[in-house]
UniProtKB/Swiss-Prot annotation:
UniProt source species: Homo sapiens
InterPro entries attached to this UniProt entry: Cadherin-like_dom, Cadherin-like_sf, Cadherin_C, Cadherin_CBD, Cadherin_CS, Cadherin_N, Protocadherin/Cadherin-CA
UniProt gene name: PCDHGB3
SUPFAM superfamilies the record matches: Cadherin-like (SSF49313)
GO cellular component term, pick one: plasma membrane
Biological role stated in the UniProt entry: Potential calcium-dependent cell-adhesion protein. May be involved in the establishment and maintenance of specific neuronal connections in the brain.
Record domain Cadherin: where: 31-133, 134-242, 243-347, 348-452, 453-562, 570-675
UniProt-recorded name of the protein: Protocadherin gamma-B3
Length: 929
């Protein structure tokens, strides 16, 4: 009930109307489109509007691409309006011969979607051919004894036209002895016969001349004539007679040449020459004469050519029997040709394009196939199929039309093309078949992502590389074709931020070669990572990423930098004091140097280049420790010089040199004559300052002697007070390394603020102020409260009475066992250090040096560090916590003393360590002074 009510409404009526129209359209498309035209139309003549008859609009023509599929194209389709036009000469007689109906059949193909349309064109005959006789003159011999009413066969005229345009009538010129009758063959063609109206008399008229005219039925009619010459022969009263008026025979089309078809026979009751019969063809065309032969004596009909059912299926032949007396008889021979399976099927591809995209859906039409077999019946029925295993199949549309469609997934990267063999087989016995191979090209689509040849890339680049040099080459492959497989390379990310990426590296979009845009510095940038992207040119674009890690390898491009000893202001030399009683192995001083490079390029060695007294001192190869090799002789000079070279371990080693000035003396007073040997111009102000400084120095020496005596009694070990400086113009005692708040271009820059005497013309002391930016670090030997300010400082009066007192040195400085230079604190002769195991340890060490130097610049580094810091203040560089590196942690010593440092609890503020009460009391007295 619900369904019937749904069809009754407006929607149901529209649905029924749509189904009705759809059925009509389907019926119309399934039936062939028929046209009728006369033959011999001019080229370009209109046959019909095919597009309109197919239901196509003018706008659909460019996309549907209508075209004719036929073995011989007599027609074409106009792409502008869809008209079916004549493209070649159409001669009905040449195409169809004597067939009553001449039809040209062909297929029309339309694309998008792909469809077949069957078209038939009926070719109408026009009267374009006149009747013709094979001979202009025909001789006919008739016995004078011929009876009235006797008939004589005449040559028929041939007219290729059919229907009303064919031969319709024969006319004979008027004659009292003869008349003309017309008869029809089984096929409807007419032939004339001459009838004797009156007896002939050879003696009265031996010859008769007649004119035979053949006229067709066209409008206007066409005609032709032939001359008939009748010869009156002598009497022969018995004509031959055939055993049959019509002979019929059926032969196979594959009958070989020379085979007998049949035998005709005529009987003549006469005797002698009048009974001798001669057989001959009569009223036949040229085609029959090329296929058959008649024996004139026996009447046997044989083949001389190959019969073909597909060209013609039957022949009607006239045979004449003539005796010696010129009597004749006539019969007809009907030869029917039976079909044999002698024609293999023919395959025609109706589609021009043989390309298909690899992402085509199942059932997509690839090619249109048309088959044809000239045989008939079962011999002409065709089965079409594929040969081989392919992702395609054949779908039949009509009797002889098929579609090749996809039946599986296509992948151009695996199989770029298919050679498909199509086989058509008929149903004859035995069956015949034919094959045709077509090549189907698979069109590429962008379905493959570029793939890098490596999962990740790591390259090493030596620093100081030339800008623009290639540092890496990444490669990616894309199996697609054309733009889909054309790969371009881009840098999409890096860890160089906030640095500008374009100023460091670039990549060639075509080749994937990565170029350095600048020279890299291992000391500033040791490694960075890039993310490169390979992108194809397809639509949509597909891409893949890969990481490229660039490791900047170190080169030996930084020479060692000597931290200690350093030159004073204006290049003045520094001196170290050595006790005259120093035993062999006594630690005199230590050369401290650093190298901004890494690895073996920063592995330093120390060498004595020149010595004022060779053999007096030894130098640790790796530690830089200067020790006495023997005791000082009595005649040897107290003032010694050593020229020390520091070399790194690079392939082409770099070096730095430093001059050490050493004085053998047991007290400060002993060195004063050496310091004042140089004559200087007299300056009253300088002399005053000199006396003040000397007085202060004497007081300090007395105080230090008292402190040293107390400590020696307590600790039962001898020690010598450290001297603060040498009082001589142009000479400075100890330099104070301090770390700048901001680093220079090198990795570990140091600034040294010496506590030195200025170069003046008088033998006086001027103590310079510490620079403001370097004031935060504290000196190991004297703090800021112990410095004497020069008269150049406006905040300090020039009188010597207001000079501040210097705090005594801390005599309880010793290295612990863990703090001693080298691998153990007790060794002296170890000139080789243990280098870090790998570059990472070295880089970690340098990072710690930088961090410690930064703390020193902030004033946070103190003298008494924990275990492993070696007791260094910020002025002597960063606090070292690694015990296995001999470069920096061993290069610390107490100038002028062989005592080792320990962690002091108190600062150098004039107070002794908490462990010694006597020292504390003496320090308090000095403060009161």
């Amino acid at each position: 009930m619900g369904n019937s009510s749904g069809w009754r409404g407006p929607a149901g009526q529209r649905r029924m109307l749509f189904l009705f129209l759809l059925s009509l359209l389907d019926q119309a498309l399934s039936e062939p489109i028929r046209y009728a035209i006369p033959e011999e139309l001019d080229r370009g003549s209109l046959v019909g509007n095919l597009a309109k008859d197919l239901g196509f609009g003018v706008g659909d023509l460019p996309t549907r691409n209508l075209r004719v599929i036929a073995e011989k194209k007599f027609f074409t389709v106009s792409p502008e309006n869809g008209n079916l036009l004549v493209s070649d000469r159409i001669d009905r007689e040449e195409i169809c011969g004597k067939k009553s109906t001449c039809v040209l059949e062909f297929e029309m193909v339309a694309e998008k979607p792909l469809n077949f349309f069957h078209v038939t064109v009926l070719i109408q005959d026009i009267n374009d051919n006149p009747p013709t006789f094979s001979q202009n003159i025909t001789e006919l011999e008739i016995s004078e004894l011929a009876l009235t009413g006797a008939t004589f066969a005449l040559e028929s005229a041939q007219d290729p036209d059919v229907g009303v345009n064919s031969l319709q009538q024969y006319y004979l010129s008027p004659d009292p002895h003869f008349s003309l009758i017309q008869k029809e063959n089984l096929d409807g063609s007419r032939y004339p016969e001459l009838v004797l109206k009156a007896p002939l008399d050879r003696e009265e008229q031996p010859h008769h001349h007649l004119v035979l005219t053949a006229v067709d039925g066209g409008e206007p009619s066409r005609s032709c004539t032939t001359q008939i010459r009748v010869i009156v022969a002598d009497a022969n009263d018995n004509p031959p007679v055939f055993t049959q008026d019509m002979y019929r025979v059926n032969v196979a089309e594959n009958l070989p040449a020379g085979s007998s078809v049949l035998k005709v026979m005529a009987i003549d009751m006469d005797e002698g020459i009048n009974a001798e019969i001669i057989y001959a063809f009569i009223n036949i065309g040229k085609e029959v004469r090329q296929l058959f032969k008649l024996d004139s004596k026996t009447g046997e009909l044989t083949t001389i050519g190959e019969l073909d059912f597909e060209e013609r299926d039957s022949y009607t032949i006239g045979v004449e029997a003539k005796d010696g007396g010129h009597h004749t008889a006539y019969c007809k021979v009907q030869i029917d040709i039976s079909d044999e399976n002698d024609n293999a099927p023919e395959i025609t591809l109706a589609s021009e394009s043989q390309h298909i995209q690899e992402d085509a859906e199942l059932g997509t039409a690839v090619a249109l196939i048309k088959t044809h077999d000239l045989d008939s019946g079962f011999n002409g029925e065709i089965l079409c199929q594929l040969k081989g295993n392919f992702p395609f199949k054949i779908v039949q549309d009509t009797k002889n039309t098929y579609r090749l469609v996809t039946d599986g997934a296509l992948d151009r990267e695996q199989i770029p093309e298919y050679n498909v063999t199509i086989t058509a087989t008929d149903k004859g016995n035995p069956p015949l078949s034919s094959s045709k191979t077509i090549t189907l090209h698979i069109l590429d689509v962008n379905d493959n992502v570029p793939v890098f040849h490596q999962a990740s890339y790591t390259v090493h680049v030596a620093e100081n590389n030339p800008p623009g040099a290639s540092i890496a080459h990444v490669r990616a492959s894309d199996p697609d074709l054309g733009p889909n497989g054309l790969v371009s390379y881009y840098i999409v990310a890096s860890d160089l931020e906030p640095r500008e990426l374009s100023s460091y590296v670039s990549v060639s979009a075509r080749s994937g070669v990565v170029f350095a845009q600048r020279a890299f510095d291992h000391e500033q940038l040791r490694a960075f990572e890039l993310t490169l992207q390979a992108r194809d040119q397809g639509s949509p674009t597909l891409s893949a990423n890969v990481s490229l890690r660039v490791l900047v390898d170190d080169r030996n491009d930084n020479a060692p930098l000597v931290l200690y000893p350093a030159l004073g202001p204006e290049g003045s030399a520094l001196f170290d004091m050595v006790p005259r009683s120093a035993e062999p192995g006594y630690l005199v001083t230590k050369v401290v140097a650093v190298d901004a490079d890494s690895g073996y390029n920063a592995w330093l060695s120390y060498h004595i280049v020149q010595a004022s007294e060779p053999g007096l001192f030894s130098l640790g190869l790796r530690t830089g420790e200067v020790r006495t090799a023997r005791t000082l002789g009595d005649r040897e000079a107290a003032r010694q010089r050593l020229l020390v070279t520091v070399r790194d371990g690079g392939q082409q080693p770099l070096s730095a040199t430093v001059m050490l000035h050493l004085i053998f003396a047991d007290s400060l007073q002993e060195i004063q004559p050496d310091l004042s040997d140089r004559p200087t111009p007299s300056d009253p102000q300088a002399e005053l300052q000199f006396h003040l400084v000397v007085a202060l120095a004497l007081i300090s020496v007395l105080f230090l002697l008292a402190v040293i005596l107390a400590i020696s009694l307590r600790l039962r070990c001898s020690s010598r007070p450290a001297t603060e400086g040498y009082f001589q113009p142009g000479v400075c005692f100890k330099t104070v390394p301090g770390v700048l708040p901001t680093y220079s271009e090198r990795t570990l820059p140091y600034s040294y603020n010496p506590c030195a005497a200025s170069h003046s013309s008088n033998t006086e002391f001027k103590f310079l102020n510490i620079k403001a930016e370097n004031a935060a670090p504290q000196d190991l030997l004297c703090d800021e409260a112990s410095w004497f300010e020069s008269n150049d400082n406006p905040e300090m009066p020039s009188n010597s009475g207001n000079l501040q007192k210097q705090a005594p040195p801390n005599t309880d400085w010793r290295f612990s066992q863990a703090q001693r230079p080298g691998t153990s604190g007790s060794q002296n002769g170890d000139d080789t250090g243990t280098w870090p195991n790998n570059q990472f340890d070295t880089e970690m060490l340098q990072a710690m040096i930088l961090a410690s130097a930064s703390e020193a610049a902030d004033g946070s580094s103190t003298l008494g560090g924990g275990a492993g810091t070696m007791g260094l203040s910020a002025r002597y560089g960063p606090q070292f916590t690694l015990q296995h590196v001999p470069d920096y942690r061993q290069n610390v010593y107490i100038p002028g003393s062989n005592a080792t440092l320990t962690n002091a609890a108190g600062k150098r503020d004039g107070k002794a360590p908490a462990g010694g009460n006597g020292n504390k009391k003496k320090s308090g007295k000095k403060e009161k002074k």
